[in-house]
């Protein structure tokens, strides 16, 4: 499902990955681990065509990454960055933005599914009526996971999805991701959390 073949990623004169290869089969829940600065986030971005690929090959599903296939690849992927910047005033506006990416409209049925997902992540549906400034970073992370699931993408790429969470909230996220894996999703997540990684089906060590 996801594959890199001898890739190198370089920012200016700094090479963060050199000759790296990996393979993630469909339906795998994989955790990327390694020391700070070793290229974990860059690897996630490489699958989206967002990292400066110096050499090597990246494949997502049936596509080999190129300027011609980036758009098709991104339509298969749900991406949650670690530093989540949402340039909107309200939670509702953020939801509508994500839904537009998937050509979806916010209606009663979408709200019903979204509220179910929020509950699974330990969040109340009244969060949908709040301003973004009123919710914490950890709530934003969980809220965005609930929204991204509406897009029904085959691949989930997550950068430190539990970093800002307490133990209880972290466990909500892990349970939610394991449920997505059972539904056939392929999940690749960066994490420093030993408990999180212990529940994954594969480890990508950098």
Where are these regions (language model features)?
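Helix-to-loop junction immediately C-terminal to a conserved catalytic motif
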Residues: 48
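Conserved ABC transporter NBD signature motif
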Residues: 52-64, 73
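Q-loop/switch helix immediately C-terminal to the Walker
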Residues: 89-104
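Conserved ABC ATPase "signature" region
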Residues: 108-127
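Conserved ABC ATPase signature
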Residues: 131-135, 139
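Catalytic Walker B motif of ABC-type/P-loop ATPase nucleotide-binding domains
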Residues: 156-160
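Helix N-cap at the start of a conserved alpha-helix in ABC-type nucleotide-binding domains
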Residues: 167-169
